[in-house]
């Protein structure tokens, strides 16, 4: 089992293999983005796409075990490798491959790794030296219909009342 970073020029060749898993993973993340955004951002070289691959299998569908999407984020005091998506089947066979992403991050000059994940991932990553430092709390904000109101050369947003 190996983790293979997909070069930008090869992304189109594997996209049909990984797109569904990316779409499904994003369905759990507030649905504020979609797989098209991941594809476009990866094509701009702002995301890195990796596939979890077992080359000993005969069929392509059997070789593919999952996908990882990472992002190098530049912050004021250093770079961070953010694991944006990690998903796949038979996780126990490949979870150790996070070390390959860590090597990549080190080569890119990152000072740390980070990810926001569902609670079950904490146990997996604790076994690889990660620790919980924060909790993410979310609340959906319902947007009211708004209309633009013009008054004396000023533009304001006002709630639309029916």
Name these PLM-found stretches.
Residues 153-162:
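Long, low-complexity, intrinsically disordered segments
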Residues 116-119, 123-152:
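Active-site/acyl-donor-binding loops of N-acyltransferases
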């Amino acid at each position: 089992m190996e983790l293979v970073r997909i070069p930008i020029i090869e992304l189109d060749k594997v996209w049909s293999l990984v797109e569904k898993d990316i779409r499904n993973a994003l369905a759990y993340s507030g649905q504020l983005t979609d797989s098209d955004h991941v594809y476009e951002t990866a094509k701009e070289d702002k995301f890195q796409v990796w596939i979890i691959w077992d080359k000993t299998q005969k069929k392509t569908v059997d070789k593919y075990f999952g996908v990882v999407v990472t992002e190098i984020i530049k912050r004021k005091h250093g770079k961070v490798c953010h694991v944006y998506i990690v998903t796949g089947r038979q996780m126990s066979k490949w979870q150790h491959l996070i070390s390959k992403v860590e090597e990549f991050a080190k080569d890119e000059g990152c000072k740390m790794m980070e990810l926001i994940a569902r609670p079950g991932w904490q146990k997996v990553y604790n076994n690889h030296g990660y620790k919980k430092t924060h909790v993410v709390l979310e609340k959906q904000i319902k947007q009211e219909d708004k209309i633009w109101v013009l008054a004396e050369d000023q533009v304001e947003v006002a709630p639309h009342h029916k």
